[in-house]
């Protein structure tokens, strides 16, 4: 095989059609490309749609964290400042992350949509994929690949105090500033 596909979109089946449409448009700063016949196509970039909603004619069972299936979708921002801007914007609208995690390789905020699906907003903590891969093959990541919880409220304070971004985006900083937060794996799987 010589052709490599690129990811196009995710389709979510829902009985909370309007709430899901509005949530994804808000969280991803996206817009509806098409809506009708129980379908909604949403995009935030050059692709004609990145998220699609399939409206169920009857009420669906709630998300079951104990069932097999996709756990979350993830969306990357260019800078910590961009991620913080989105965090602050969403917070002002009453949308707060359920699980902030310093993975080491990424700094991530996990939200839950109205159906309970996780959506990760993140930044890469390394400049290149090779650097990220090297970190993932190193001892810190090998010892704790999920990472540690942190309080995103503390990041703007740290930046204002002159703490470098490459320090804030580490396990060590998260553990120093918020040592008593619960294991993020529990929140991600419940």
UniProtKB/Swiss-Prot annotation:
PROSITE patterns: EXTRADIOL_DIOXYGENAS, VOC
Entry keyword Metal-binding: yes
The keyword Oxidoreductase is annotated on this UniProt entry: yes
Domain of life assignment: Bacteria
One BP term from GO: catabolic process
Binding-site positions, Fe cation: 9, 72, 120
Cofactor(s) it depends on: Fe(2+)
Catalyses which reaction(s): biphenyl-2,3-diol + O2 = 2-hydroxy-6-oxo-6-phenylhexa-2,4-dienoate + H(+)
Pathway in which the depicted protein is active: Xenobiotic degradation; biphenyl degradation; 2-hydroxy-2,4-pentadienoate and benzoate from biphenyl: step 3/4
Enzyme class: oxidoreductase
Family classification: Belongs to the extradiol ring-cleavage dioxygenase family.
The protein, known as: Biphenyl-2,3-diol 1,2-dioxygenase 2
Species this chain originates from: Rhodococcus globerulus
Gene: bphC2
């Amino acid at each position: 095989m010589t052709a490599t596909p690129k990811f196009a979109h995710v389709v979510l089946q829902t009985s909370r059609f309007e709430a899901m449409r509005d949530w994804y448009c808000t969280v991803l700063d996206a817009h509806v490309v098409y809506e009708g016949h129980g379908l909604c196509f949403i995009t935030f970039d050059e692709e004609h749609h990145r998220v699609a909603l399939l409206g169920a004619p009857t009420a669906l069972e709630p998300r079951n964290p104990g069932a097999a299936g996709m756990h979350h979708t993830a969306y990357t921002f260019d800078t910590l400042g961009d991620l913080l801007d989105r965090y602050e914007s969403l917070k002002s609208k009453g949308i707060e992350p359920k699980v902030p995690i310093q993975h080491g390789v990424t700094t991530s905020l996990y939200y839950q949509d109205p159906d309970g699906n996780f959506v990760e907003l993140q930044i890469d903590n390394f400049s290149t994929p090779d650097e990220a891969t090297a970190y993932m093959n190193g001892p810190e990541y090998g010892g704790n690949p999920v990472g540690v919880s942190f309080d995103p409220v503390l990041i703007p304070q740290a930046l204002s105090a002159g703490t470098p971004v490459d320090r804030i985006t580490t396990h060590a900083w998260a553990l120093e500033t918020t040592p008593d937060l619960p294991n993020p794996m529990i929140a991600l799987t419940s």
